[in-house]
UniProtKB/Swiss-Prot annotation:
The modification Phosphoserine is found at S237, S262, S267. Ubiquitously expressed in fetus and adult. Highest expression in adult pancreas, liver, skeletal muscle. In fetus, highest expression in liver and lower levels in kidney, and lung. Exclusively expressed in the glomeruli along the glomerular capillary walls. The chain crosses the membrane at residues 20-40, 78-98, 105-124, 131-151, 168-188, 191-211, 304-324, 357-377, 419-439, 446-466, 485-505, 510-530. It is found in: Cell membrane; Apical cell membrane; Endoplasmic reticulum membrane. The gene is SLC43A1. It catalyses: D-leucine(in) = D-leucine(out); L-leucine(in) = L-leucine(out); L-isoleucine(in) = L-isoleucine(out); L-methionine(in) = L-methionine(out). It comes from Homo sapiens. Pfam families: MFS_1. This is Large neutral amino acids transporter small subunit 3. Glycans are attached at N57, N212, N229. PANTHER family: LARGE NEUTRAL AMINO ACIDS TRANSPORTER SMALL SUBUNIT 3, LARGE NEUTRAL AMINO ACIDS TRANSPORTER SMALL SUBUNIT 4-LIKE ISOFORM X1. Keywords: Amino-acid transport, Cell membrane, Endoplasmic reticulum, Glycoprotein, Membrane, Phosphoprotein, Transmembrane, Transmembrane helix, Transport.
Length: 559
């Protein structure tokens, strides 16, 4: 029932559009936890932990049917902690599984888990006193299903050639913007729609993801455009010829003759044959398959190691702000002073709530900012050639052709140039974000919100595009998963930083923000290394005239 790779290629725009919608409404929806928390408390989850005589210290409205207390908040936040951990920690094993089995089975399992998550939450709400513990399993399945959908969608841009980075940025942007989903559901809930109805409807919509994947996603993984056998897999494997020539053999002849024609025609005075014999074709075809790059060399490459530091630092900066934004806003409103009267406390709560709502709504900007960084990564790629061939370089030198008169733009060099621009811009915005955090001006926080949202969309998109450009496509899932896992470990440091801010620093965020600002300067090390690596690669091209196959097998290892 699964389509072939050629059929999936013809449906690639449908798959891309539906993947964006699926990411937006079904991927990292746990990032909108604040709205879901209010719904769960209104439904009475873990209200049994509150004393019967409790007059909760949280705000209650007239529609509230259940008591609330700090114990209830702790239990529900524990569920969120488990779900968010699953969302981040499972990226590495998912990447390994996806590299081995392809995206189709992973996506099917992810959509099934998300469906089960919504169903469990709906069933648990029918008897919250007995079934409240199901929320832990439901949130775990929600996080796991969401990351499965996100990871598999990142392989789709391989079907779009020069638009790959832009499409990948759009996928990551829809993932980052999914934090708006639960606030939208809360609006529906506040309009009077029952929580059970909402969850069962959401579960039914998740079943459509399973159906869409079954009908349109192929069993094979999507090859990257720069792979040697990309054209064979996408365009030629289904080609039937009257002369009984198979797709593989036809591809071999086309590739061999293409390489021959791309070189300078040899002179008869050299004593070499000007034409290729059948033996030459067979001999060349034996060397045609791309040499496999070991995973350990990609893992130990300086590019990947520097990206781990940059992404971990940025993740810590972003997650800490998301965790402490309410406390920071409260400090800006109160100036660090406690207000005893209820009127003053209510005013502070309303102001913080308003700014928090604006910050949540701005997460949709990720859907617009992520394609922008993808456009930067795709800049002038379509005007590039793969690499200089040795025959071309030697022929030009022999005939006295000035290489400076015709300087082709090489794809590998251009991708590195675009990555340098993308990471430099992202780090500059991150530094600007850190500076605005240091300024005690409440209205300036709107600028801080915008910078935070842009950086959150930029750095994931830039990293994914860098990995796709530099490393072999069969390593993409493993490298991305390991990077996400390391970044999640870095993000755990936000808890002691938060405790230090609300404890010894008495709510003042200045010193923590200053330390994080200085730490964020390390992000410029990655584009600095990429600049050095690009210069070295340019020297190799100029000195050796490396061909495309040698570049693919050699330069990626030393990246």
């Amino acid at each position: 029932m699964a389509p072939t790779l050629q059929q999936a290629y013809r449906r690639r725009w449908w798959m891309a559009c539906t993947a964006v919608l699926e990411n937006l409404f079904f991927s990292a929806v746990l990032l909108g936890w604040g709205s879901l928390l209010i719904i769960l408390k209104n439904e009475g989850f873990y209200s049994s932990t509150c004393p019967a005589e409790s007059s909760t210290n949280t705000t209650q409205d007239e529609q509230r049917r259940w008591p609330g207390c700090d114990q209830q908040d702790e239990m529900l936040n524990l569920g969120f902690t488990i779900g968010s951990f699953v969302l981040s920690a499972t990226t590495l094993p998912l990447g390994i599984l996806m590299d081995r089995f392809g995206p189709r089975p992973v996506r099917l399992v992810g959509s099934a888990c998300f469906t089960a998550s919504c169903t469990l939450m709906a069933l648990a709400s029918r008897d919250v006193e007995a079934l409240s513990p199901l929320i832990f399993l439901a949130l775990s399945l929600n996080g796991f299903g969401g990351i499965c959908l996100t990871f598999t969608s990142l392989t789709l841009p391989n079907m779009f050639g020069n638009l790959r980075s832009t499409l990948m940025a759009l996928m990551i942007g829809s993932y980052a913007s999914s934090a708006i989903t639960f606030p939208g559901i809360k609006l529906i809930y506040d309009a009077g729609v029952a929580f059970v109805v909402i969850m069962f409807t959401w579960s039914g919509l998740a079943c459509l993801i399973f159906l869409n994947c079954t009908l349109n996603w192929p069993i094979e993984a999507f090859p990257a455009p720069e792979e040697v056998n990309y054209t064979k897999k996408i365009k030629l494997s289904g080609l039937a010829l009257d002369h009984k020539v198979t797709g593989d053999l036809f591809y071999t002849h086309v590739t061999t003759m293409g390489q021959r024609l791309s070189q300078k025609a040899p002179s008869l005075e050299d004593g070499s044959d000007a034409f290729m014999s059948p033996q030459d074709v067979r001999g060349t075809s034996e060397n045609l398959p791309e040499r496999s790059v070991p995973l350990r060399k990609s893992l130990c490459s300086p590019t990947f190691l520097w990206s781990l530091l940059t992404m971990g630092m940025t993740q810590l900066r972003i997650i800490f702000y998301m965790a402490a934004v309410n406390k920071m806003l409260e400090y800006l409103v109160t100036g660090g002073q406690e207000h005893e009267t209820n009127e003053q406390q209510q005013k502070v709560a309303e102001t913080v709530g308003f700014y928090s709502s604006v910050f949540g709504a701005m997460q949709l900007l990720c859907l617009l900012t992520c394609p922008l960084i993808g456009y930067i990564m795709d800049w002038r790629i379509k005007d590039c050639v793969d690499a200089p061939t040795q025959g071309t370089v030697l022929g030009d030198a022999r005939d006295g052709v000035a290489t400076k008169s015709i300087r082709p733009r090489y794809c590998k060099i251009q991708k590195l140039t675009n990555a340098i621009s993308a990471f430099t811009l992202t780090n500059l915005l991150l530094v600007g974000f850190g500076i605005t955090c240091l300024i005690n001006n409440l209205h300036l926080q709107f600028v801080t919100f915008v910078l935070h949202t842009i950086v959150r969309g930029f750095f994931h998109s830039a990293c994914g595009s860098l990995y796709a450009a530099v490393f072999p496509s069969n390593h993409f899932g493993t490298l991305t998963g390991l990077q996400s896992l390391i970044s999640a470990v870095f993000a755990l440091l936000q808890q002691p930083l938060f405790m230090a801010m609300v404890g010894p620093l008495k709510g003042e965020p200045f010193w923590v923000n200053l330390g994080l600002l200085l730490f964020s300067l390390l992000g410029f090390l990655l584009p600095s290394y990429l600049f050095y690596y690009r210069a070295r690669l340019q020297q190799e091209y100029a000195a050796n005239g490396m061909g495309p196959l040698k570049v693919l097998s050699g330069s990626e290892v030393t990246a």
